[in-house]
């Protein structure tokens, strides 16, 4: 593999139907250029997330972010596990995505069973808008989940969903060998392995 940018998603991915190209072109890179992201670009991504659908219009998503080389960066970056620090240190910004587990309606508090589901929809909007602006995003599940609520200052009725690294995609020469081999768009399962008419088919799992 070249040490330059990897093959385009079009060479590795193919849709069976007329899906808009951005869904296929977006993929999660670890190879990021250490450039600053303008605040306006980051806010545009958050604004896209804002329009996601949610149960009761509760909008349970919350985003906590830090630009690299700012005082908050070290606190957020320190939550990542060692393996993820090996590549995420070059990100332009880190974002922790959090969901609220309840909402208040007419002075009464109700649980929201779909808080994670709805926040996932907001994350998709964030990631797709970032792609349209020329940025790559990668969700990070490997972080200190026990410490994160305290570091982020969360009340008990909030849940940390994921961390996200965002930045311009770069060449892979600075990546560890184990990451270089993985730095390519991933494939997807065929439709008939997860879409069923009328009844679930366990054989496909």
Each predicted region: which residue ranges?
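Acidic, surface-exposed loops and disordered segments
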Residues: 1-205
